[in-house]
């Protein structure tokens, strides 16, 4: 059985939610749960662990990575310090930097919030060989405009899902997985 490297969102586990859906498609799963010991690491240590996982076990053209929300942010920061990832990457509701929603009066400022855009604008952000991003049009955590802007800067396709929020929904994600995991 082929193994997918999976990075769930904050507080996520490998074998529930999206991880279960990946497994139900007939794949083994490995990666980093964003709970417990891993969540207690500082951001740079989390990024280094992901980069080491990728280099040690998934650095080949047939490797596949799926990352969701903050897991996508971890992947992108790991990718920033590596050559272009040689396999395929699927990023769902990817955090790509800081965001504030005036209408909700809430925001999100992850560690190194501007780094990805700084690297991309300077031409120093390696983009994976094959990558796609999907974000909801109503996602307040992952500004769809910023996701599309980053995608354009690094040559990665970004699909905006009309009416969807941060959770893209099992039907949409199931359809994406059906195609992407073939």
PLM segments and residue spans:
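Conserved alpha/beta-hydrolase "acid-adjacent" motif
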Residues: 15-16, 140-146, 169
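Short beta-strand/loop motif that positions the catalytic acidic residue
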Residues: 127-128, 132-135, 139, 147
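Active-site nucleophile loop of the alpha/beta-hydrolase fold
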Residues: 34-37, 90-99
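Gly/Ala-rich beta-loop-alpha elbow adjacent to hydrolase catalytic centers
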Residues: 66-76
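Short glycine-rich catalytic loops that host catalytic nucleophiles or stabilize transition states
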Residues: 32-36, 159-165
């Amino acid at each position: 059985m082929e193994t997918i490297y999976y990075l769930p969102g904050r507080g996520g586990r490998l074998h529930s939610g999206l991880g279960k859906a990946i497994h139900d498609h007939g794949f083994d799963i490995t990666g980093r749960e964003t709970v417990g010991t891993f969540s207690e690491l500082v951001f740079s240590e989390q990024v280094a662990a992901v980069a080491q996982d990728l280099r040690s076990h998934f650095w080949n053209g047939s490797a596949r990575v799926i990352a969701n929300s903050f897991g996508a942010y971890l992947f992108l920061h790991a990718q920033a310090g590596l050559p272009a990832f040689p396999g395929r990457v699927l990023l769902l509701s990817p955090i790509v930097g800081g965001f504030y929603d005036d209408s909700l009066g809430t925001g999100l400022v992850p560690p190194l919030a501007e780094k990805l855009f700084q690297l991309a604008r300077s031409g120093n952000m390696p983009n994976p060989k094959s990558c796609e991003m999907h974000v909801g049009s109503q996602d307040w955590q992952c500004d769809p405009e910023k996701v599309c802007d980053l995608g354009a800067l690094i040559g990665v396709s970004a699909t905006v899902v009309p009416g969807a929020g941060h959770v893209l929904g099992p039907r949409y994600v199931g359809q994406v997985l059906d195609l992407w995991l073939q």
